[in-house]
């Protein structure tokens, strides 16, 4: 009996030690920046105006926004942009200016834990939950409704932004008039296992820490950026961009996998706007993210199963993940403009 107790105690101790070694934190190079309160600048770019503001989220976090719109012109619609992983709002300035010159207002925002949307409780690389990320986007939609009265809202999500954009539809599809996605992330069955592993890392290493095993398994923050685009100039810009994140903490990775896991949970979608026009634009060389032809068909089928009737998928040949930063980006810009002008 005594030996049995020793074995049990030893087993518990061994399990605890193994958990510590597996999920222990490693130092990370993310530096906390101070958030600046309220309005920053207003500039004029040819026939376009640009204004940087801070919108206060429900928990007090200042969300950094850039509003780009046509000067002295009526606004056709307002495009709400949700960026992808590791990046920031200013990477969409080129597309936003193009759309503004064509009559659209564009709201760029740094998702919390990215760019300038940070504070002591929300450091760089931290996304606390899917719900919180969606609440922020709903706050931005309300801001648009208040400042652009009677203008339709077009939601645009790139990469993980396309995941959040689809989850936004669950209860809020009646708030938008169109949905655009690029670098459209496929549903992956392994996401549910990723969530379990990440939750264990949260438990044993702490939500705000950086577990080496999570970093290894997720590969978020790889230094190889050639998969983004065929345009070497754009790849170099990413590598030299000090605003790009090196990775995510444990709760950030949990949120990423949890978002992907929910894409197939059809029961979560109310589908109050079944005729919502939805367009996905991807690159044929972006198979790892989109799942290629098989993954894109699955994405389209899922949206139609939910109840959306107008789902269009465009897969450009010889393009990679960031289609708006490809060598022939003009073709993509025009495709987006045509969709918004319909």
Regions found by a protein language model. Give the residues of each.
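Active-site glycine-rich loops that stabilize anionic/oxyanionic intermediates
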Residues: 81-87, 159, 284-285
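Alpha/beta-hydrolase active-site loop
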Residues: 126-145
């Amino acid at each position: 009996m005594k030996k049995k107790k020793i074995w049990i105690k030893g087993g518990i101790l061994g399990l605890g030690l193994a958990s510590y070694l597996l999920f222990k934190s490693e130092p990370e190079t993310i530096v906390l920046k101070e958030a600046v309160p309220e309005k920053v600048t207003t500039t004029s770019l040819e026939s376009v105006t640009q204004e940087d503001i801070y919108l206060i989220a429900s928990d007090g976090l200042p969300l950094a926004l850039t509003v780009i719109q046509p000067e002295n012109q009526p606004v056709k619609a307002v495009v709400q942009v949700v960026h992808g992983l590791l990046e920031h709002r200013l990477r969409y300035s080129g597309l936003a200016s193009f759309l503004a010159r064509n009559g659209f207002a564009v709201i760029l925002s740094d998702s919390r834990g990215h760019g300038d949307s940070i504070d002591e409780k929300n450091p760089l690389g931290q996304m606390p939950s899917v719900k919180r990320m969606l609440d922020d986007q709903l706050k931005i939609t309300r801001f648009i409704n208040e400042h652009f009265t009677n203008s339709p809202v077009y939601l645009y999500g790139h990469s993980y932004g396309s995941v959040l954009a689809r989850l936004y539809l669950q209860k809020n599809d009646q708030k938008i008039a169109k949905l655009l996605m690029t670098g459209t992330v496929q549903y992956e069955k392994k996401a549910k296992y990723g969530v379990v592993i990440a939750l264990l890392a949260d438990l044993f290493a702490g939500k705000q820490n950086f577990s080496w095993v999570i970093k290894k398994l997720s590969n978020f923050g790889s230094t190889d950026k050639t998969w983004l685009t065929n345009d070497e100039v754009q790849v170099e810009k990413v590598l030299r961009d000090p605003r790009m994140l090196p990775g995510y903490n444990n709760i950030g990775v949990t949120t990423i996998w949890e978002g992907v896991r929910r894409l197939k949970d059809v029961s979560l979608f109310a589908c109050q706007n079944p005729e919502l026009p939805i367009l996905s634009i991807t690159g044929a060389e972006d198979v790892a993210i989109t799942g290629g032809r098989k993954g894109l068909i699955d994405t389209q089928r899922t949206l139609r199963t939910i109840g959306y009737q107008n789902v269009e998928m465009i897969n450009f040949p010889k393009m990679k993940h960031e289609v708006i930063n490809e060598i022939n980006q003009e073709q993509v810009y025009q495709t987006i403009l045509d969709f918004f002008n319909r």
